[in-house]
Amino acid sequence: MTDARRRFREAIFGGDVVFAPLVLDPLSGLIVEESGFSAGYLSGGALGFQYAVSEALLTTTEIADAARRITSRCQLPLIVDGGVGFGDPVHVVRAIWEFEQAGAAAVEFEDQVSPKRVHHHIGIEHLVSTDEMCAKVAAASEARSDSDLLIIARTGAMRHEGVDEGIARLNSYIEAGADVAMAFCRDQDLQQVASKTSAPLATITSLDQHSPQEWRDYG
């Protein structure tokens, strides 16, 4: 999957918008690939729903197995949602090993506490300190054996601590080794976040009603 990683890295840093629809299994991966998308997104939340459990109950190996099944059947670059990293930095290292071997093109981690609280699904975030998250990001960055594997750092701070705090956290995560910043915020805040963070910006939308040009304008 080195070629998929390289293609994804080039797409991310190429300056255009990259769309990554939800992919949960080989069939959906093939559909997304045949439809011409540049990447797919293996969501922890959606995978938990598929298994009829909360994302908080998923294990490293369950997610890695799902990723491996997808990447074994298609060449689509796959973003793997690593949730909160399954514990401390040492657990993040194990996760990177597993996801990299499973063919991930990028791995996303977020700054919620571990184990992840199910309150996230009703809009309540329980965040770790910036220093704790930076330690996880640094561990992830150092653990990868393929430099083309992207580390995506996501913050939930904007919901409850404000946009400025979210931006400050994201820039700290980038300094710690994250390649891409992910913000979960209102559409109207995305342009500000993009202009004030020093890495490509990613976000999640459950019902995308924007055109590619509108996403470019957001940054």
PLM regions with names:
Residues 2-218:
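Alpha/beta enzyme core
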